[in-house]
Amino acid sequence: MQRKKLSGVAVAVLCALTLAACGKQAETQVDRVAMEAKAKAESEARAVEAAAKEAAKEAEARAIAIESYIYAYPLVTMEMTRRVMTNVAAPDGSRAPMGHFLRMRSYPDAAYRDVTAPNADTLYTTTWIDVSKEPMILSLPDMKGRYALFPMLDGWTNVFQVPGKRTTGTKAQTYAITGPGWSGELPPGVTEYKSPTGLVWILGRIYCTGTPEDYKAVHALQDKISVVPLSAYGKPYTPAPGAVDPAIDMKTAVREQVNA
């Protein structure tokens, strides 16, 4: 069978159609590659954005955790100190239950670790009290010119009042420590000190020369210091014994426990 020769025009048309088909196919392939590249780029961009958001969340969470730790550190320190210093049934010379006065009869020695840096020339006379339900009345005797101070710390470790020789003199004084939101009448001659928190630490210190004679004189002053609820003021009062919690670590320094 004899093939017919295509005319020049037919050949040209056929070539044009072939080129057009090839061009369209190439164009389709390019479009597909471009779309795939775009999709991949968008996917990678979303992944980078998600990773950045996750990193930002982690950084924010870490920053909040650090700020929370710093913010709460005083509260935790005070609470841990209170637990250790009051975890006894009765005053034992270096610790006392809530509402009882701890009357240290000698200078703190090197083994004393309830506070970080105790004074070495004063006798501590301290108590932890709860004024969330009713005021507590603090009575101080005439110190007869002796240097003494009774800082009152709230639950944040902030000192909100400091009766003592420099601020209020050394004559006999009586104070009502009241909690947040309390209002009411106080006995005549009683000065009100408002605490920002229900927990208060009275960290009293009385100067002592360290001689046997001066120890005896300061002991007599310590014995005249008292704290009682407002409802018991002017009446016989014995504070309730403490409850001992065996789970509390009484050996490790408070600072080390808080920082652990």
Task: Walk through the language-model features, giving the residues of each.
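Bacterial N-terminal signal peptides that target proteins for export
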Residues: Q2-A10
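Bacterial N-terminal signal peptides
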Residues: A10-T18
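Bacterial signal peptide processing site
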Residues: C22-Q25
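A compositional/structural signature for long, glycine/proline-rich flexible linkers
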Residues: V30-A260
